[in-house]
Swiss-Prot record:
GO terms for biological process: carbohydrate metabolic process; glycerol-3-phosphate biosynthetic process; glycerol-3-phosphate catabolic process; glycerophospholipid metabolic process; phospholipid biosynthetic process. It catalyses: sn-glycerol 3-phosphate + NAD(+) = dihydroxyacetone phosphate + NADH + H(+); sn-glycerol 3-phosphate + NADP(+) = dihydroxyacetone phosphate + NADPH + H(+). GO terms for molecular function: glycerol-3-phosphate dehydrogenase [NAD(P)+] activity; NAD binding. The active site is at K193. Keywords: Cytoplasm, Lipid biosynthesis, Lipid metabolism, NAD, NADP, Nucleotide-binding, Oxidoreductase, Phospholipid biosynthesis, Phospholipid metabolism. Sn-glycerol 3-phosphate binds at K106, G138, S140, K193, D246, S256, R257, N258. It is an enzyme of class 1 (oxidoreductase). It holds the Pfam family NAD_Gly3P_dh_N. NADPH binds at S11, W12, R32, R33, K106, A142, R257, V281, E283. Gene3D superfamilies: N-(1-d-carboxylethyl)-l-norvaline Dehydrogenase, domain 2, NAD(P)-binding Rossmann-like Domain. It is found in: Cytoplasm. This is Glycerol-3-phosphate dehydrogenase [NAD(P)+].
Length: 340
């Protein structure tokens, strides 16, 4: 049994805390709202994020970092990209020794275009309280993980031993974990699939069917691969769990908040209206901005991302964006997979 702190008490953080508790670990789940943590400690539920689910009694809720982090042997970060730097700055002073950090967030920082592991490393550069950084990613709706339905994910780190440690920490009969040495590819695939899920949602809102969805997913994976390999990822990673696997589950399920947000946009709602209705973070919106800017900087052809960016940030009508996508210059399919 190990003492593990899970920072972020939303649906995904709570589901991962359940996996760790099922594996016999002492789990401290850290949230911002005292009433939410009181509910967890008294009734062992988190109805706002995982309705009708009973959490293991070995999960304890905390709002204070100092109390939650005392004596922990590993930290799992499950917070939005925009909160990642601040969260790392808050936890580092309370670490009594260097510990491994596992993050299960998906995004790219718009201001710097940094991946999440890069952000974490930068915030720990002066203290060296983090011994290793691992990402956990893959096709994994929190609702299904909490119901203990069979799920497979991948973990990646620059440190192979850290990846194996994370695999052992999480793996059980319902939650199968693979390792992958391609940290860049796993992070890029997990982040950029949210863009394609948004785009698939938009096409659904416009009334288009499965043909359109399949086209967006397939060509979307091609541009994810182009950007990822340019940034140093291995092409094969994008055909795995953190690439194709995550893309399928996020683009085809009503559980996906990015897909649902995209559908509302396709139906004519403004971005502000969508965010108000969702009531939760839609990572794909910020990631669309970051990926578009990266593609311009690196001169990578990403037409789906560009079209979605024009809808989200330039006010282009979704029908017009779809027409422009279909009217692009003739191309060879395979030759354009890994180059612009």
């Amino acid at each position: 049994m190990q003492k593990i702190a899970v920072i972020g008490a939303g649906s995904w953080g709570s589901a991962l805390a359940m996996v760790l508790a099922d594996n016999g670990h002492d789990v401290r789940l850290v949230g911002r709202r005292q009433e939410q943590m009181d509910e967890l400690n008294e009734r062992h539920t988190n109805e706002s994020y995982l309705p009708n689910i009973e959490l293991p009694t070995t999960i304890r809720g905390y709002t204070g970092m100092e109390e939650a982090l005392g004596g922990v042997e590993a930290i799992v970060l499950v917070v939005p990209t925009k909160a990642m730097r601040e969260t790392v700055r808050k936890i580092v002073p309370y670490l009594q020794k260097a510990v491994p950090v596992i993050h299960a967030s998906k995004g790219i920082e718009p201001a710097t275009h940094k991946r999440i592991s890069e952000m974490i490393a930068e915030e720990d550069a002066s203290t060296n309280r983090i011994s290793s950084i691992t990402v956990l990613s893959g096709p994994s709706h929190a609702e299904e993980v909490a119901l203990r339905q069979p799920t497979t994910v991948t973990v990646a780190s620059a440190d192979d031993e850290a990846a194996k440690y994370t695999q052992n920490l999480f793996m059980n009969q319902q939650f199968r974990v693979y390792t992958n040495p391609d940290l860049i590819g796993v992070e890029i695939g997990g982040a950029l699939k949210n863009i394609i899920a948004l785009a698939c949602g938009v096409t659904n809102g416009l009334g288009y069917g499965d043909n359109t969805k399949a086209a967006i997913m397939t060509r979307g994976l091609a541009e994810i691969s182009r950007l990822g390999t340019t940034m140093g990822a291995k092409p094969l990673t994008f055909s795995g769990l953190s690439g194709l696997g995550d893309l399928i589950v996020t683009c085809t399920s009503v559980h996906s908040r990015n897909w649902r947000a995209g559908r509302m946009i396709g139906e004519g709602l403004s971005m502000d209206e969508v965010l108000e209705k969702m009531g939760m973070v839609v990572e794909g919106i910020r990631t669309t901005q970051a990926a578009y800017e990266l593609s311009e900087k690196l001169e990578i052809d990403m037409p789906v991302t560009k079209a979605l960016y024009s809808v989200l940030f330039n006010g282009i009508d979704p029908y017009q964006a779809a027409e422009e996508l279909m009217g692009r210059v003739k191309r060879h399919e395979v030759e354009s997979l890994y180059r612009s």
